[in-house]
């Protein structure tokens, strides 16, 4: 690594010397601890750079994956739309086309990042890691080499110091000893000075080398930090450029979206659809609809309107809409509205029923029969029916009996008792207002065959050639027989066995 820049390392007037205490052979490590500390420090820097390399390599992999995912995302958009003639060619589909194209552009930008990272950042960091590895080797090599030389010279000096000590030992006696040249303290001392001079020279050289290595390490660390800062700056510029592109892509989608009008697609659809409704359409009416069988005789009731029914066993009054059909059924509905009440609540099959005579005082008569809907349990029950007036009552009564006569139905005579009598005092609490709401009739102009008031019912009337038994005959005195049934085989449709 080429180092540059002015050093900011603190200057020293003197190179520190571990032997400044004056010992010939100092008990020190010759800066071995400092060299080890520098080595450990830059090994830490190398690990930090390796971590940064791993980060950018993962970013490279992430960018590649993002490019693939964004490209896959762009292919989710179907354009043009598979259902033809649903949308305008340059309407809402333009938004989807913009989404697809701009998403593909984002994928391309992500792929570009994965291409730029190795050349601009990762390779530089890998070179920096190699420089750190070499620097650590240099610290170890130079530091170890100098220490070995110093230690060798110190050992040599220590050897001659020991020889000098042995040479001086005889001279500590009272009389001077006899010595040879090798044992002469003067010669040995000169040898000590020679070794000590070489030792000090090596120590000084080693101290200078370690100081220079320390200064170089300081500048190396400065350059190392500068490289990392440059790398981060490059990364910031790269990502900022990518984000600006992403924003531009999204803004393009928004621009295409804003160009669409709210009614554009619908206007195009209205032009393409041949059956599109322009303007208002008159509403359909059920009454105006014609269908097969409408207004055929079996579908139109013989008689229809509101009646009040009272059951003998429950003593309960119930007002309902009644319809007597050509099928012979007398149906009861909650209301006349077929939309709300299409199914009957109660029904009597008239040919199987016994019809009593009308009351002489009140507009009512009785029918004995069985509920055809099976909602009322039991075999046969007596049902009293009351109309709004005598005229209405006789229209109902005559319609029922006329139908029985037309079908030539013979009622079995096994039930000789017939319908029970209706008391004249029964239903005294009926409210005339019960019949005021929209009573539906078959025809408001239908000719009635009974227009006399109820007081006139006491006299015998003729309907064809038949005699109608009076209501009083059915009310049963203690000794009178009030049982009566209708016999269709007799003369006329009002033939009764009383």
Swiss-Prot record:
Chain positions found as Phosphoserine: 175, 312
Which GO terms are recorded in the biological process aspect for this UniProt protein?
actin cytoskeleton organization; cell-cell fusion; mating projection actin fusion focus assembly
Q: Disordered: where is this region?
A: 1-23, 416-475
Under InterPro entries, the record lists: AH/BAR_dom_sf (IPR027267), BAR_4 (IPR046868), PH-like_dom_sf (IPR011993), PH_domain (IPR001849), SLM1/RGC1-like_PH (IPR046869), Slm1_PH (IPR043453)
What molecular function terms (GO) are annotated for this protein? phosphatidylinositol binding
Pfam families in the record: BAR_4 (PF20400), PH_20 (PF20399)
Write down the PROSITE patterns for this protein, in alphabetical order.
PH_DOMAIN
Q: What's the main place this protein lives?
A: other
Keyword line: Phosphoprotein
Q: Residue ranges of the PH domain?
A: 300-405
Cysteines paired by S-S bonds: none
The listed locations are: Cell tip
Q: Which GO terms describe its cellular component?
A: cell cortex of cell tip; cytoplasm; cytoplasmic side of plasma membrane; eisosome; mating projection membrane; plasma membrane
Functional note = Effector of the TORC2- and calcineurin-signaling pathways. Mediates actin polarization via inhibition of calcineurin-dependent transcription. May play a role in the response to the disruption of sphingolipid synthesis, where dephosphorylation of slm1 leads to the activation and phosphorylation of ypk1 through the TORC2 and PKH1 pathways, which in turn phosphorylates orm1 and lag1 to activate sphingolipid synthesis.
Q: What is this protein called?
A: Cytoskeletal signaling protein slm1
Q: Which organism is it from?
A: Schizosaccharomyces pombe (strain 972 / ATCC 24843) (Fission yeast)
The gene it comes from is: slm1
């Amino acid at each position: 690594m080429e180092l540059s820049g002015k050093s900011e390392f603190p200057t020293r007037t003197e190179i520190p010397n571990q032997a400044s205490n004056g010992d010939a052979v100092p008990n020190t490590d010759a800066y071995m601890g400092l060299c080890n500390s520098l080595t450990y420090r830059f090994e830490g820097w190398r690990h930090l750079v390796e971590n940064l390399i791993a980060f950018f390599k993962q970013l490279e992999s992430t960018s590649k994956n993002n490019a693939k995912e964004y490209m896959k995302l762009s292919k989710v958009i179907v354009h043009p739309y598979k259902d033809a003639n649903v949308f305008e060619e340059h309407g809402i589909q333009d938004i989807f086309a913009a989404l697809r194209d701009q998403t593909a552009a984002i994928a391309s930008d992500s792929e570009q990042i994965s291409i730029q990272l190795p050349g601009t950042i990762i390779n530089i960091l890998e070179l920096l890691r190699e420089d750190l590895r070499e620097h650590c080797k240099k610290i170890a090599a130079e530091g170890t080499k100098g220490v070995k030389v110093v230690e060798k010279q110190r050992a040599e000096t220590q050897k001659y110091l020991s020889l000098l000590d042995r040479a001086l030992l005889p001279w500590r006696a009272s009389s001077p000893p006899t010595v040879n040249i090798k044992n002469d303290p003067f010669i040995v001392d000169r040898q000590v000075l020679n070794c000590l001079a070489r030792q000090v020279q090596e120590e000084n050289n080693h101290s200078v080398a370690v100081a220079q290595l320390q200064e170089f390490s300081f500048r190396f660390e400065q350059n190392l930090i500068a490289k990392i800062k440059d790398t981060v700056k490059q990364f910031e510029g790269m990502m900022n450029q990518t984000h600006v592109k992403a924003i531009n892509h999204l803004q393009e989608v928004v621009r295409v979206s804003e160009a669409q009008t709210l009614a554009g697609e619908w206007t195009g659809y209205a032009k393409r659809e041949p059956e599109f409704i322009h303007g208002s359409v008159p509403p359909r009416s059920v009454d105006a609809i014609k269908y097969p069988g409408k207004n055929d005789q079996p579908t139109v009731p013989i008689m229809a309107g509101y009646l009040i029914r009272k059951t003998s066993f429950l003593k309960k009054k119930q007002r309902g809409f009644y319809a007597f059909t050509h099928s012979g059924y007398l149906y009861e509905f909650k209301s006349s509205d077929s939309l709300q009440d299409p199914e009957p609540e109660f029904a009597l099959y008239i040919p199987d029923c016994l019809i009593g005579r009308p009351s002489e005082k009140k507009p009512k008569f009785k029918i004995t029969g069985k509920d055809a809907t099976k909602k009322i349990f039991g075999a046969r029950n007596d049902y009293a029916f009351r109309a709004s007036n005598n005229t209405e009552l006789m229209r109902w009564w005559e319609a029922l009996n006329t139908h029985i006569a037309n079908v030539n139905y013979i009622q079995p005579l096994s039930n000789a008792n017939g319908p029970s009598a209706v008391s004249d005092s029964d239903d005294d609490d009926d409210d005339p207002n019960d019949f005021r709401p929209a009573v539906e009739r078959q025809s408001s102009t239908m000719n009635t065959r009974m227009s006399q008031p109820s007081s006139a019912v006491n006299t015998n009337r003729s309907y064809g050639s038949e005699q109608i038994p009076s209501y009083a005959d059915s009310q049963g005195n203690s000794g009178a027989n009030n049982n009566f049934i209708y016999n269709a085989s007799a003369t006329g449709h009002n033939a009764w066995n009383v």
